[in-house]
């Protein structure tokens, strides 16, 4: 997003050094309290492993503001994980790039050409789809029920591509 001149607010991580490292890399702010980041963001990307999505959502749900979009850059979990989103006044979705992330300081360069799937609340899906397509990415909407199968297929296929390329380079 930074390479496309998106207006980024910053990062929060339970490991403050990791948030500061990401913030320095993207020339944004590192937040030491999640409330600050939630309060200042119109779109909030949660980039945790699936096992932490629900606990993180439960922590920030009461901090979210009306019309905010919450987007999980997900594995196998769908936007159904965001229980109580309607009552909180937020629109939630999950977005999944067909891309392996092997290095946090270089993998982002491949995002420009990545294919994404998105599912969730219609408003969130539309906003995220518009954002990604404005950057030149191809986006496909999928059904939440298909999310686990999609993730499994994406993991296998993207890892096979890496293995084939590695074999080719040898």
Task: Tell me the role of every PLM-derived stretch.
Residues 9-13, 70-73, 116-119:
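Short, hydrophobic beta-strand segments that form beta-sheet elements in well-ordered domains
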Residues 3-26:
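NAD(P)-binding Rossmann-fold cofactor-contacting core
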Residues 30, 34-106:
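Rossmann-like NAD(P)(H) cofactor-binding subdomain of soluble oxidoreductases
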Residues 18, 22-25, 89, 106-170:
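Internal alpha-helical scaffold of NAD(P)-dependent oxidoreductase catalytic cores
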Residues 10, 30-32, 141:
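A structural preference for short, hydrophobic beta-strand core positions in alpha/beta folds
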Residues 2-3, 35:
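Hydrophobic, well-ordered beta-alpha structural blocks that scaffold small-molecule cofactor pockets
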Residues 15, 74-77, 99, 122, ...:
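Glycine-rich beta-alpha junction loops
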